[in-house]
Amino acid sequence: MFNFNEDRFVKVIEDALSLRVDLEKIIDDLYYKGFGNLFLIGVGGTYAHFLPIKYMSETLSTMPVHVVQAAEFILQNNKHFSKDSLCVFCSRSGDTKEIVEAITFCNKSGATTLSFVCNSGTPVCELSKYHFVSFAEDDHLAECIYLGMYSVIFRLLKNRGEFVEYEKMFDQINSIAPFLVKAKEQTEEMSKSLAKHHRNTDYHMVVGSGAVWGEAYDYAMCILEEMQWIKTKSIHAGEYFHGTIELTEEDTSIILLYGEDATRPLMDRVYNFASKISKEVAVFDTRTVELPVDEKYRQYLSPLVIYTMLERFSCHLEKERNHPLTT
């Protein structure tokens, strides 16, 4: 595969998975000590990657989970937040301004702070009551985040008696690395062709729903806009017909991200309409990917898998547009 280091990728996956035992001990301790609610506090991509976690929790649990934008959270006087809140953060660099400020704010309020970070010895590590370090660069960051966050959310639900199959699912997830490599391999040619075709396209729509809505938001803003400087709109499939439909034309690039949860009919509705109007509809679907988990668990892995697939498109866009993904 073009510009892909399999050994580096597999190491990111295995390092993230290796956090599970220590994470479980901390999560169990926090659960049995008791906490009022869970706050997932992010900015940019980390905010986006928290959205699927909230979606999953809402389908499985009555546990109060709040996903908030870090800068806004500090200013808004959120009445759900208190010293009894468990606050989770993620930062690749370890010095993200808004995250550092939010952790400081939570600490001053007496709340418990737990962070995932890719670089040790950074402010996020130093400020958080608990921190877990697992190195990743931007291209494989979401895999690292999701594998950590799955342990957090599903362990909490397991302790609440709302996800009793925790050990079974995670024993299967432990062997996921080669399946993610295969997902990239099977997406390679499509991604190469799509990137070549869209090398000069100046506007995209990215559509998602359910557990992959956060990835649609992330891909539009953090990859196509931030890293490729392409005007892009992320659209929830359920909202497409309430405005965006009017901008769909024959040459409109529409990238559909399909997960495997109950919201697939929303995506089908967009596809069935948009494909009659636009000749530029592309589909990335996690259902096409073989995974080592039981069918009923696949929906929870869909945001991780869609991110893994999209990395191939990003890599080829970088080449075709001669525009680095580090910008």
What are these regions (language model features)?
Residues 174, 282-286, 303:
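Aromatic-enriched
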Residues 275-276, 287-325:
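Structured C-terminal subdomain patch of bacterial secreted/periplasmic proteins
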Residues 31, 36-167, 209, 257-286:
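Glycine-rich phosphate-binding loops that contact phosphosugars or nucleotide phosphates
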Residues 2-37, 138-141, 154-235, 325-327:
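Active-site phosphate/pyrophosphate-binding segments
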Residues 120-130, 244-247, 290-299:
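Glycine-rich, charge-decorated loop segments at or immediately adjacent to ligand/cofactor-binding or catalytic sites
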Residues 21-26, 72-79, 241-244:
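Structural motif
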Residues 84-86, 249-258, 295-306, 310:
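Short basic, glycine-rich beta-strand/loop surfaces that mediate nucleic-acid
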Residues 213-281:
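Internal helical hairpin/lid segments
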